[in-house]
A protein has these predicted regions:
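Short, extreme N-terminal segment that most often corresponds to the first beta-strand
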Residues: 1-35, 211-217
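Surface-exposed, low-hydrophobicity interaction/linker segments
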Residues: 23-59
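Charged interaction segments
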Residues: 47-217
Length: 217
């Protein structure tokens, strides 16, 4: 069974025309079991558009969305979130942005994601439909980030065996159990901070670059 990857997309800079187009696209979504099939965004009944059956085929989803399946769970005028198989729907997001930038070439968008373990987490920022910057961290890098902010937890980690410390019988020590619980409690706070910092810095860079090179009429 595929690992679920949760994702969340924010349109940080988006004009009214692009918002209106996004609203049109989301009107194609049909709720099924409290969620929406990602590919239905493009099922609008117009000539040349895919059908409901087509966007559910493996070849279409992997070519246009990325993951073999992907669901949207919630959306509004400037964000949406959901989950997918094995990876985030980066291709699907670019496909959305290629449409929205027709109405707002200065649209700025971010996506954050993590798999359910998490084995990896990441973020990307897009200027228009072009990826400006991003980062993906694996479980070891996540652990190092947590330990850097909570050095007392590192004392109970066994680097040689890549696990929490155990006693002579191979059982986790009481101190290691407590450290693991604390680690789990603060892990997503550290992850969210890493992602937010990266996104904020990238958006600041994009805006400063645009101020230095204003758009030409």
């Amino acid at each position: 069974m595929a690992n679920h990857v949760s994702f969340y997309v924010n349109f940080h800079e988006i004009n009214d025309a692009a918002k209106a187009r996004w609203k049109e696209m989301t009107q194609n979504l049909v709720k099924e079991n409290y969620e929406y099939w990602f590919g239905d965004l493009w099922v609008d009944g117009k000539e040349g558009s895919p059908t409901k059956d087509e966007v559910r085929k493996y070849d279409w989803t992997t070519d246009h969305i990325g993951p073999k399946w992907c669901y949207i769970q919630d959306f509004d005028e400037d964000s949406f979130g959901g989950y997918s198989a094995w990876s985030a729907p980066e291709d699907g997001l670019v496909k959305i942005l290629e449409e929205l930038e027709k109405f707002d070439p200065n649209i700025i968008t971010s996506i954050t994601y993590d798999d359910e373990m998490p084995n990896f987490v990441g973020w990307y920022v897009y200027s228009g439909s072009e990826m400006e910057d991003g980062c993906e961290d694996d479980d070891e890098e996540i652990r190092e980030a947590v330990f850097d902010q909570n050095p007392h937890l590192r004392e109970h980690w066994d680097d040689a065996n890549d696990e929490w410390q155990c006693d002579e019988d191979g059982d986790m020590t009481e101190e290691a159990y407590a450290a693991e619980d604390e680690y789990r409690d603060c892990m997503y706070e550290v992850i969210n901070e890493m992602q937010a910092t990266g996104i904020d810095d990238c958006i600041k860079f994009i805006k400063e670059a645009r101020e230095e090179q204003p758009a030409q009429d």
